[in-house]
Regions:
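Bacterial N-terminal signal peptides
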Residues: 2-17
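Active-site-proximal cap/lid insertion segments
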Residues: 26-29, 38-51, 145-157, 171-177, ...
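Short, solvent-exposed turn/loop segments enriched in Gly/Ser/Thr/Pro and often Arg
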Residues: 46-51, 65-88, 99-102, 122-132, ...
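Short phosphate-binding/catalytic loops that engage adenosine nucleotides
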Residues: 65, 118, 281
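Extracytoplasmic/secreted proteins, especially bacterial periplasmic and envelope-associated proteins
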Residues: 30, 51-62, 66, 80-83, ...
Length: 340
């Protein structure tokens, strides 16, 4: 099992074609895409990060394959998402920002799978124009804030809302159809208009209290000064660096809350996988974890993403394929892979 230069979206789309050729007695593979936000390649224990706690995603890597050199083609939220859904570069899919891509829906992986009899759902962040709810059997899109007002009038965290909706999808899906669910988290994206930026759930605040998160060797004024002249103090990446990282105290506060959000996403991924196991379908489900782009943690004197440094374009990719030989479980693939 080697993905090599086969890209993620086209890999998913191939599942649809393969199901048509399967014998009637075989069960088509379900597809679960766990799609995080602003999460770079090394925000995983499995990737060697000794501070962030991601036990459920680490376990997923132990049961599948982790791709160490996976990159997005464009490190911009909406564009990167369009590339994943369509399997096409920005120059072909027509999305140059946050608009709806021009590629026909039937050519996207949700479209292909639904056309082939799948029960298809999307939960969480969309970010490509108006959410096309009519194209999904189960569609709930929301983003932009860490806290929402719930049905009972109480506040609910966006990651908890993601979890509730994902479990509802799995518990209410028709048992006689395969499913494809894209669970698109808003965390670990910052709430840009909020002074605290990263707002985890109260129970997570005890995490990372007693650690000091190291600052990268290239998170220096010298690294900033080496950038081309069009990187000035008006640059949005530099502006957001001031929001988040321009003092040692601010860096520690922001990074700890960022990691808390990551651990919450990890927990929700685990709850969803537990439900699949409870239903007896985990070993008939292709599970993919990846993200829309990386993230500067003050490297080069920047924050956020957008530019072609590894911190910005290199993202995690874990694939758990039940057809994978057991000897491949827990392996890594160092081939160059892309999100288109």
């Amino acid at each position: 099992f080697i993905l090599g230069f086969l890209t993620v979206a086209n890999f998913i789309a191939l599942i649809a074609g393969a199901q048509v050729a399967q014998a009637a007695a075989d069960k088509p593979l379900n597809v679960l895409v766990l799609y995080a936000d602003d999460w770079r390649h090394d925000t995983l224990g499995a990737a060697g990060n000794t501070i962030v706690k991601t036990p459920r995603l680490d376990a997923l890597a132990d049961q599948g394959m982790r791709f160490t050199q996976n990159c997005v083609t464009t490190s911009i939220c909406g564009v990167s998402r369009a590339c994943l859904y369509t399997g096409q570069w920005m120059s072909r899919n027509g999305c140059e920002g946050f608009n709806m891509f021009t590629t026909p829906w039937e050519q996207t992986y949700p479209g292909k799978l639904r056309e082939n009899g799948y029960h298809v759902g999307h939960i969480g962040k969309w970010h490509n124009g108006k959410f096309p709810k009519q194209n999904y059997d189960f569609g709930r899109s929301y983003q932009g804030k860490h806290w929402f007002e719930g049905k009972d009038g109480k506040k609910i965290h966006v990651t908890q809302r993601n979890e509730n909706d994902a479990l509802e999808f799995l518990k209410t899906r028709p048992a006689d159809k395969p499913f494809c669910l894209t669970l698109a988290f808003f965390a670990t994206h910052a709430e840009d208009r909020h002074p605290d930026q990263f707002l985890p759930q109260p129970q997570s605040m005890k995490l990372y209290q007693d650690v000091t998160i190291p600052v990268a060797a290239n998170a220096t004024e010298e690294s900033w000064q080496r950038l081309p002249s069009f990187f000035d103090e008006k640059n949005e990446g530099r502006n957001r660096w001031h929001w988040r990282f321009d003092t040692p105290e601010k860096y520690q506060t922001m990074m700890k809350n960022y990691y808390r959000l990551a651990t919450e996403v990890d927990s929700t991924c685990g709850k969803v996988l537990d439900e699949l196991k409870k239903q007896g379908v985990l070993d008939n489900t292709l599970v993919i974890f990846t993200t829309d782009n990386g993230y500067y943690h003050a490297e080069h004197g920047l924050a956020d993403k957008w530019y072609p440094h590894q911190e910005s374009i290199r993202v995690p990719l874990i694939i758990r394929d039940p057809r994978m030989p057991e000897k491949k479980h827990g392996s890594t693939n160092n081939d160059f892979t892309l999100s288109v």
